[in-house]
Amino acid sequence: MGFLLLALAILPFMRSRPASLDWHRDKDEAFQTARATHKPVLAFLYADWCTYCRQMDSTTFRDPHVIKDLGRRFVWLRLNAETNPEGADLQRRFGVEGYPTLLILDESGNEIDRLSGFVPPDQFPERLQALVDGPDSFPGLEQRLEENPDSAEVNFKIASKYLERKQFQEAGEHFGRAVALDPENQSGLADDGLYYIAGTEAMLGQVDNALATLKELRTRFPQCYYST
């Protein structure tokens, strides 16, 4: 009798712990769930040939702590970015160039941030949480920039986020702001900033501007890594 009562007492807790991540394989269904539950979507984009994608599947996504701590905090969506039309659409829309990539999307499908490459299970929860609501998450950086628009560091960090999203115009503007705020390279941002500005200009088809920026980099900071 005592064993039966104990079993009945712990049964609800056993049922409340997911045994695995509840993956959606249909984008519309995933976002329907996200809107109903007001949870962000984690869209895992992978390819069949991707070794690190398989490693994420066999380790990180099967880790009991990941499942327990994160399983019900997000809506999980997995799509093959090469063979699934919905996966290919997300790949094009968000400029994903490597796998695995985990897009963190709000319930309306807007990108919050992203996690690229293999992340082991012991690092995954902390890194994911930092991207969702940490000070260096995209929303966190937007807030920090609003509070301190003259921070070279914040401008550089948000520029890097834009660059990762292939938003080259916005990236170049904030890299330029970082360079202007650190003209003597005291924070070690101006030389990197000029290099990345040249890259954004090249991606925007502004080849002459890119060459001029590289010349400026070599002139102002001849000892930097990019000038050698």
Features from the language model and the residues they span:
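Thiol-based oxidoreductase modules, predominantly thioredoxin-like and allied folds used
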Residues: 21-25, 46, 59-86, 99
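Short active-site neighborhood of thiol/selenol oxidoreductases, capturing the structured segment around
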Residues: 37-50
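Structural micro-motif
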Residues: 39-41, 88-104
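Non-catalytic, surface beta->alpha helical segment in thiol-disulfide oxidoreductase systems
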Residues: 61, 96-136
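Short solvent-exposed coil/turn linkers within tandem alpha-helical repeat scaffolds
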Residues: 64, 114-118, 148-150, 165, ...
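Structural register within alpha-helical repeat arrays
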Residues: 157-158, 197
